[in-house]
């Protein structure tokens, strides 16, 4: 994809990439300043609901690393703490053969020196899942709008016991089986568990469909 690609690849807004976004991350509890639609796509697809991501930051970061005897200034946009370690992430439109070779060199040198990984994210990594961008953005907006919503300890304990016993199922059955509580509170708690990585949630069009599948993650 070229730099003139349209946002409909991710957002269907028919405008050129480069929009500036302020978004709230429920995972990190901070407002993110994202400088393009592809950063939004990367955040919502790969970070916000990724159970292996503990926390992350976006900024204009840089670090110096020695590669083949020469010092290089490496720039990157995201600093991501996975459960298995830290990774610096550079984000751009495309990744040609030269960029792929550079990515491998930086990753190897950075790992040897600091045990930190390096990854180059491009459109080819994002486009295959672009249809999930808007559904996940809507889910994130729902969680943000309800981030201060009180949920009773009884419901929380009940849901924890239910998912621990059932381990997987369809959202509709979960709502039926837990019918002593309000559907809106049950859905909010389920989505909070998805956002925090306790459960996985599989959906085709939108996570708000009662036919969506949930599954307790194995730690």
Describe the predicted segments one by one.
Residues 1-219:
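Electrostatic, structured charged patches in enzyme active sites and in nucleic-acid/phosphate-binding
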